[in-house]
Amino acid sequence: MASIRSCTPAILLGLLATLGDAAGLLVSHYNGNLYSLSFIQDGNTGQLAVKQTLKAGGGMPSWLTLDSDTGSLWVTDESTYGSPVLTQLQVGSDGTMKVTGTSKSNGGEVHSSLYGGSNGKGFIAAAEYDPSSISSWKLPITGNTQAVQKLTYTMSGRGPVASRQDKPHPHSTFTDPTGKYLLAPDLGADLIRIFAIEASSGKLTACTAAKTGGGDGPRHGAFWIPRAGSIDGTMLYIVNELGNSVSAWTVSYPSGGCLTLAKTQTVSTYPTGKSAPNGSKAAEVHVAGNFVYAVNRNDKSFGSTSDSVATYSITLETGAITFVEATNAYTYYPRTFQINKAGDLVAFGGQTSSTVAIVQRNTTTGRLGPQIANLLVGTRGGAGNEDGLSAVIWNE
């Protein structure tokens, strides 16, 4: 095979045509487009290319949720004007996307996850940031699909960060390891909302929410289980956008009651002795093996257009996290990132740079390495604006 670095785009696409199982990624952009990317790796180098551009996902496609078993893809719409939609697509074996259904949504959706049904994939729940609500739909999505439920929240006054905590702002939804509970960090209310799932109907019943630190602004979360096949010792790690930190929570399952959380520690997304730069915001969090990763937006730690990602190690016995290092995310304003199934590559999506960067990861040490590929996708965004790349996921 020719060296990737010597390939022209035409040659690269030819190579990809012969590599049916080459890795791929899916990207959403606030310009109203979805993109299917190809990625091929040659040792310590790689190359990304756009295979398909599709106008879909509403006015502001904001998040991608993929069922890799069936190739079904759902896209939420953050726009609150016009006619916001929830879109379902089918992703072919070659990465080509095709819309299979759309349904009217409330708008303001910034994140979604599958839950319920017989296999944990019968419904989809979306966090609606500006509407202060969480809505859910039965799958599959068609033109006649109606929301199963819409839960709307209020609060009596502003939070400690008054400019951002003017009202409840649910920012994500995700299920616990048992699939029996749905959680939704609320940035505006400083809460982690917890719901019991009725699998057959998709109904969500509120449990007692967990209270975060004042002004933390919880955004996303990721679970960790110390031993496969057991929920004993389960931990939840929440990234706090306003606090620029990650909090560790123990997870308990009382007999006859709801899932409960207890916070054990909060650790900065920056090294000891370094304060979060003015205007920086922590974004997404993921767990891989015994490591936690959280991205920082607008910290410019590695240059005017290069932000950082924090790595933490997890203590097996306690679930406590220790800051390891901050490394280059090779993107500006990384709103989104995902680790591949093999655990050896990380895809970062820069909202403002509108670039996808592929970075190597050591599966033993957990440390992130050099960038091996980078691609501009769509048009660049403006600093502080929601007009660039919104999400990137591996298609695997």
Language-model features, listed with the residues they occupy:
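A short beta-strand motif characteristic of beta-propeller blades
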Residues: A49-A56, K98-K104, Q149, G157-S163, ...
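Short coil/turn segments that connect the beta-strands within blades of beta-propeller domains
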Residues: A22-A23, D69-G71, G120-G122, T178-K180, ...
